Amino acid sequence: MAMKSLSFLAALSLLALTLPLTIASDPSQLQDFCVSANSSANGVFVNGKFCKDPKLVTADDFFFPGLQTARPITSPVGSTVTAVNVNNLLGLNTLGISLVRIDYAVDGQNPPHTHPRATEILVVELGTLLVGFVTSNPDNRLFTKVLNEGDVFVFPEGLIHFQANIGKAPAVAFAALSSQNPGVITIAPTVFGANPAINPNILAKAFQVDPRVVMDLQTKFKK
């Protein structure tokens, strides 16, 4: 009887350990691809998404042109991000990957931000970048590296990270992300540009500054 109880407890413990892993894992694909359909008119419902009828899929559904061309840099931080994700390359649906091109002006940066659903791996195509990420609480450890052309750096999923052009000429980088739609939370505009605005007194206490400093920042980032 005691042996049976021990066996039951062992099995229960094993189930408790493996169940969270099972729940956290994405389901395996049941088809070669699932090109996202803009409407359900010519689609089939697979794995929670409307997918284009495979018989209507063409090579263009897996194609995105133009990453060889830089977009104008008009942002105050001096960078432009061109994203290729499931929103503009429908064939990425269910494939768990996306791509971005980042152009940096001289002294430009891709400011501190995080991707809530993806790990990022970045390669420098042109120029020199200072990159880094910060670990979670309580250590908040900073890892930084200077990257030159051809160098690669990885940013773990969910951690705050950044890139800054420290060269004397414009820079270009490409990055792959482990999600078809990784999302992005840029820290400064998210905190100070929230809509509706976060109470300045809350942010003043969090950042240990005068509320007038917070209100000035909120004015700058107001959408």
Curated annotation (Swiss-Prot):
Gene Ontology MF: a single term: manganese ion binding
Protein location: Secreted, Extracellular space, Apoplast
Residues annotated as signal peptide: 1-24
Keyword Metal-binding: yes
One GO location term (cellular component): apoplast
UniProt cross-references to PROSITE patterns, sorted A to Z: GERMIN
Binding-site positions, Mn(2+): 113, 115, 120, 161
Domain Cupin type-1 residues, every copy: 65-215
Keyword list, A-Z: Apoplast, Disulfide bond, Glycoprotein, Manganese, Metal-binding, Secreted, Signal
Functional summary from the UniProt entry: May play a role in plant defense. Probably has no oxalate oxidase activity even if the active site is conserved.
Protein name: Germin-like protein subfamily 1 member 10
Organism (species): Arabidopsis thaliana (Mouse-ear cress)
